[in-house]
Structure formats: C-alpha cells, structure tokens
C-alpha cells in the first residue's frame, strides 16, 4: 500500500495549527537566558560580511560550534535588526516545516498509515509543550534548524533504502542524505549518533541490515566524528563543565536513567515545565528517584529485548530514543541542568511514529484529537511563559522555590528594572541555596557596591574570589570597594592581580590600568 501524499490542504492545516499555538512568541522579547550573551551583547553575529562569516565559522561562543545557525541569525539581523519578532518568526516557521517533515517521516516508516493519522502524529510532535523551549527561545534556533536537516537526512536515507530494495540506484538520495546530515551538524552537533539510528532503521522497519548497510554508514560516521571533536572542543570552554572527580560515572549513569524516564513522563504529563532543572550539587545515586528510574529503564530494556521478534517496533523505538538522547544524558555533563525540555525535540519522534501507527481505529483517533486540544492549550500557556525575562524567572521560582539560578536571574531582571532591594533579596536567596554559586555572590557584591555598602561589597567579592580566584571583574570591583573604604594598599593589590590575569587584548584592561594609576598617585601623594 502506498504512503499518503502530503496534500496542500493537509499541509495548510498543520502549518496553521502550529503557528497558532506558538503565536504568542511573536510578541516575546529576548530573555535573560543566553539571549543576552548571543544577541543583545554580541555584535559579532550582526551581519553576513566576510568578517561576520569568518567569526561564525570559527567561534565556539557559548560552548557551541554552530556556524549554520549563526548564519541564519545573521540573516535575521540583516532583515530585522534587533527586533526579536523576526527571530521568533523564523523559529516558528522552521518548526512548522519540521512538522510537515514529521508527517512525511510517518508516511515513509508506517506502511498503510492514513493521511489523518500521519497529520495527527505530526501535530502531536509539533504542538507538544516540550517543544516550546526549542521554538519560543531565540537562542535555540540551532534546535529547529538542525532538526530540519536531521529529518531530511532520515527521509532521504529511507528513500535511498527503498530504491535499493527495488533495484534502483538511489545515489542521488544517498548523497542528499549525507549532505543534509552535514548541514544538521553545522547547525548543532547533537545528531552525532544518527549513523547508529540509521542502522536501527535498517533492522526495522527497513529490514535491510547487512554488511553493505554497515559500509553505507561510513560517510555519516566520519562527519559525526568530526562534529563530535568540534563539539567537545567547544564544550571544554564552558566553566560549568563537571569533571569526573566532581561527578563520577555512577552518578552520571544515575542521571542518564533519570533523563530517560523524565522525557517519557513529561511527554505524557507535560506540566511544571522549566527552563532549568537543576542537577544536585552532589547527586546521590542511591536516592529513591534515581534507583526507581534505573530499575524502570532496565525493565523497559529487558522487555523490548524479550519481545524483539514479536514486536520489533518496540525495540526499534526504544533504541532510537536512547541513541538520540545519548549525548545529552549527562555522560559529558556541561552546565547546571540535569535534563532540559529542548533535548526532547528529536528524541521523542519514535513515540509519535508509534502513536500514528495505531490511529487507524476511530476510538484511538478520537483520543488523539482530544489530546491535541489539551496539548495545544498547554503549549500556548507555556509559550507565554517565555514572553520576557520577568515572566520566565517568576514562573521558574514559582514551580521550583529552591532554584538558585532562577533567583540569580530574577535578581538581575529586578536590578535592570531599578528594584535594587528586590534584587539584593534574590541574590541572597541564591547564595543561601548554593553557597558555592559565585555568580550570585558577585551579583550581590555589585548590588552592594551600587547601594554604597562598600565594606559588604568587598566581603562578597572576597567570597566570590575564594570560589573563583581568576574572576578578573571581581578583583577589579573589590579594588574599587577597597578604594572607597580607603584601603588603598589592598585596592592596588587587587588592580595589579586583575591586570596580571586579564588577557592583553581585553577591552576593560584600560579601565583597570586607570584605576591602578589613580590609587598609586594617591599613595604617592600621601608618601606611602
């Protein structure tokens, strides 16, 4: 039986529903959650001149190598300037295209699936609240863009495999698949396990696993290896990366099991979604939630192995799910998060394919359509959470009152708004919940400096430097606080150390040199 074509009317319905659910994002601002680092404070991406393109191709900015994503953002800037509407519009349109590609993927992988079932499956993917982070957050352009080429890679590969099975060459489809994979990796390197996913598809549903099928994966594997090296080099620049001494293999395995269960659970019950789910400062693998998740993952794995001959679809779906998530489960932990909604963007595709496969029955279709209505409402609500920095971090504090990152960011928002007392309270809440969180100590110190509490500021900067002795800005600011309290010798020491640590080409060096010169001149006049 032939697969259903994507007719214009069906495509239009899918696009309209997707755009409608994410429409609130068009009124959203850039948020204080990497958007500042990537857009408002980053002139390097603003344009497509040779110098801009050179930066995009070589930078590891923010711990990522994503030149193609930067190019699309540079194009957005060329059209929209710093108006966030254009950036959000591009994300939404890319996501809508991905929904159409998911329809095509379902049609390609599920024999005899109806157009209605494929459309519902595509919408279950597209308007699920777990997608909001990838779509409504301008920084995550890399998700929707790399996802587009990831889907095209798989679709072209399936076309190639079908052609080979029918005795046709299929070389163009194979070349297109490899090229799309390269583009996906240029947008974001999270697809490095795709060669293994294609091998799973060779086993089921394509049923063409062979030595030749293995050899076909060589170009994919070479691209994946190159991207993995670049991704690792980029992530090495992220200060929040945890070493094995800080987060051992047993702890990472527990985190991985938790992640595998988390995305399944949130797919079924997508409530209390957050921009940051904090990894404990010290993860205890014997804690009930980690033991329970490990047992559940083991049980699912054993079950799909036992029924692999009778239900090969179960083993294929579980394998693809695990493989797509493998790079973000914590084995190479970067950042303070234990899980993240955005990591589910591609990983949950196997489940929507399976759901679409059983929607031939009217009762199942009715349940799925009802679920779409609920998911659509939840997605609209979750998109509004990302409207601005204040709403984002108010929401996060509300659902997780111990989230020290949320307190820091809400405090920064309050500081920008002129609410210095509120900001000080948030910074204090952050350091109470994580005494090692030097960013919060630094922010509270800076707030104290602004409020004229120079002694308190110097004390908080000292705590910051005890945690991170190489924090140049903290050294300079402690020097200013000490200077204000007439501790000129201490101020001079701080300015000298800041200059020793600061890179030669760092723009603020001139300011620190001026601070040091001023202190030295004052000391000289006093004869000290």
What are these regions (language model features)?
Residues 488-504:
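TPR/TPR-like (Sel1-like) alpha-helical repeat modules
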Residues 404-405, 438-439, 472-473, 506-510:
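Helix-start (N-cap) detector for alpha-helical repeat units in TPR-like alpha-solenoids
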Residues 1-425, 429-439, 443, 477:
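Polytopic membrane enzymes that build or remodel cell-surface glycoconjugates and lipids
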Residues 396, 429-430, 463-464, 497-498:
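Canonical positions in the second alpha-helix
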Residues 416, 450, 484, 515-518, ...:
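Register position in tetratricopeptide repeats
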